[in-house]
């Protein structure tokens, strides 16, 4: 598996191209992502959104049309693609597939799991491909996603942290902002955040 990364826009939101067996999955195409994605993908299969915030989905519509590929988004965040609730001027897009909580999908023989971790947003997910976890704004290196936005939920975030702490397997985490880390390296940080939410 090959993973390309490019921070995008004012908030340096990480856009990823995850390539498995020659198949490209575009994860969180944010502000200005189109040119970079078009230059670095050869066999695009789908756009995968970890959640619906504008800086993660800004280029959804443009890329979907240019590449003729579908958009997969957690069902509870699809309204954000359509309505721009934070009023940032994000281009409207529509999910071709509204992903259920903890749903496993198979695309071109590649297994992808949308792990449900609400809190930062109602439908916030971490997308698993092999032993890699694209965590969006759920987990960062040494931190977690904010829970003071409209539609955020501190209580849901606590449940999500307890959920991920119950996992026995380790994963390489590719977050929505900042550098990669390992789940095993974030356990102490995650436990401490439970006291501050």
Q: Which residues does each PLM region occupy?
A:
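Catalytic core of the metallo-beta-lactamase
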Residues: 1-43, 92-166, 182-184, 194
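Secondary-structure boundary/capping motif
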Residues: 5-7, 17, 47-52, 60, ...
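Active-site neighborhood of phospho(di)ester-bond hydrolases with catalytic His/Asp-centered motifs
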Residues: 27-29, 45-52, 71-74, 115-119, ...
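Active-site HxH/HxHxD metal-binding segment of metal-dependent hydrolases
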Residues: 31-107, 188-192
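Short histidine/acidic/glycine/proline-rich micro-motifs that form metal-
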Residues: 53, 77-78, 148, 179-181
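Divalent metal-binding pocket/active-site signature
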Residues: 79, 126, 177
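Charged phosphate-binding loop/patch that engages nucleotide di/tri-phosphates or the phosphate backbone
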Residues: 169-197
């Amino acid at each position: 598996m090959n993973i390309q990364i490019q921070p995008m826009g004012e908030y340096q939101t990480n856009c990823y191209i995850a390539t498995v067996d020659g198949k490209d999955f575009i994860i969180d195409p944010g502000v200005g992502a189109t040119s970079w994605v078009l230059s670095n993908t050869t066999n695009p299969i789908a756009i995968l959104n970890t959640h619906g915030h504008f800086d993660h989905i800004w280029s959804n519509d443009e890329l979907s049309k240019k590449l003729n590929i579908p958009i997969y988004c957690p069902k509870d965040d699809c309204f954000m693609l359509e309505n721009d609730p934070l009023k940032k001027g994000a281009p409207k897009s529509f999910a071709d597939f509204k992903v259920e909580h903890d749903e496993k999908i198979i695309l071109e023989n590649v297994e992808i799991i949308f792990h449900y971790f609400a809190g930062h947003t109602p439908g916030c997910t971490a997308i698993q491909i092999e032993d890699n976890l694209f965590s969006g704004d759920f987990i960062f290196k040494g931190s977690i996603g904010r829970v003071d936005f409209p539609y955020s939920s501190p209580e849901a975030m606590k449940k999500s942290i307890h959920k991920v702490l119950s996992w026995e397997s380790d994963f390489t985490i590719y977050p929505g902002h900042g550098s990669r880390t390992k789940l095993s390296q974030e356990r102490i940080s995650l436990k401490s955040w439970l006291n501050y939410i």
